[in-house]
């Protein structure tokens, strides 16, 4: 046995306001504390695309930037040391990045672009360990096939309000499931937190669960 075993941590800081990610951590049995941005933090600014940026690079870069911002938040607030977990999800088709829709028209345009086609859902994961070191980030890639859908059906979905705040303007675990013909990859990754990769990273960061 090593003389000095690494300490384990009974919880992780989750730097996300997504209810879906909280539910998925609950599914793993991971205890967490929310590490939300302060009102004066411009978290959305971190999601700005760079010119010509590839989707893989984009989602990993944004995820790491959010993790670093969360770690700085932890230190500034004088919180107890523990690992920080951040995830970021984007939808991509034809090399384009489909983030969160700006309004109903934007949501409808995104959904119309996805209808009858296959797109990729990328979710990046970043963990900063309790000492402040960034661990190698992970990337989950899944392919989602949408069935052809009439514009009226898509418009009705937009009217539910579900597309807002979601990459690609849909939630696979919600009413958008009626459009999903098949998936190839991680269902939890499409929801926003791939559990296989999450469990591996948290165990490597000595989170007990």
Swiss-Prot record:
Disulfide links within the chain = none
Q: Which Gene3D superfamilies match?
A: 3.90.950.10
- Molecular function GO terms recorded: dTTP diphosphatase activity; UTP diphosphatase activity
Q: Which UniProt keywords apply?
A: Cytoplasm, Hydrolase, Nucleotide metabolism
The record's SUPFAM superfamilies line, in alphabetical order, gives: ITPase-like
The yes or no answer to whether the keyword Ion transport is present is no
For site (Important for substrate specificity), what residue positions does UniProt give?
A: 20, 89, 173
Catalytic activity from the UniProt record: dTTP + H2O = dTMP + diphosphate + H(+); UTP + H2O = UMP + diphosphate + H(+)
Where are the annotated coiled coils located?
A: none
Q: Which GO terms describe its biological process?
A: nucleotide metabolic process
Q: Please provide one cellular component term from the Gene Ontology annotations of this protein.
A: cytoplasm
Q: Which Pfam families match?
A: Maf (PF02545)
Q: What is its EC number?
A: 3.6.1.9
Q: Where is the active site?
A: 88
The cofactor named in the record is:
a divalent metal cation
Protein family according to the UniProt entry: Belongs to the Maf family. YhdE subfamily.
Briefly state the protein's biological role: Nucleoside triphosphate pyrophosphatase that hydrolyzes dTTP and UTP. May have a dual role in cell division arrest and in preventing the incorporation of modified nucleotides into cellular nucleic acids.
Q: What is this protein called?
A: dTTP/UTP pyrophosphatase
**Biological classification of the source:** Bacteria, Pseudomonadati, Pseudomonadota, Betaproteobacteria, Burkholderiales
């Amino acid at each position: 046995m090593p003389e000095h075993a690494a300490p384990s941590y009974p919880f992780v800081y989750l730097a996300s306001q997504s209810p879906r990610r909280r539910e998925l951590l609950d599914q793993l049995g991971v205890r967490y504390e929310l590490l939300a941005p302060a009102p004066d933090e411009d978290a959305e600014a971190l999601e700005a695309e760079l010119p010509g940026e590839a989707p893989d690079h984009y989602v990993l870069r944004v995820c790491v930037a959010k993790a670093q911002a969360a770690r700085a938040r932890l230190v500034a607030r004088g919180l107890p040391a523990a690992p920080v977990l951040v995830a970021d999800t984007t939808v991509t088709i034809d090399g384009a990045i489909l983030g969160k829709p700006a309004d109903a028209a934007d949501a409808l345009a995104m959904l119309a672009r996805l209808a009858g086609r296959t797109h990729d859902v990328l979710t990046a994961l970043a963990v900063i360990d309790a000492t402040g070191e960034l661990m190698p980030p992970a990337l989950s890639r899944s392919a989602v096939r949408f069935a052809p859908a009439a514009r009226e059906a898509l418009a009705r979905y937009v009217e539910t309000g579900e597309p807002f705040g979601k990459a690609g303007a849909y939630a696979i675990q919600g009413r958008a499931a009626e459009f999903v013909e098949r998936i190839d990859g991680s269902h939890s990754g499409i929801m926003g937190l791939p559990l296989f990769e999450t469990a591996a990273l948290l165990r490597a960061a000595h989170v007990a669960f």
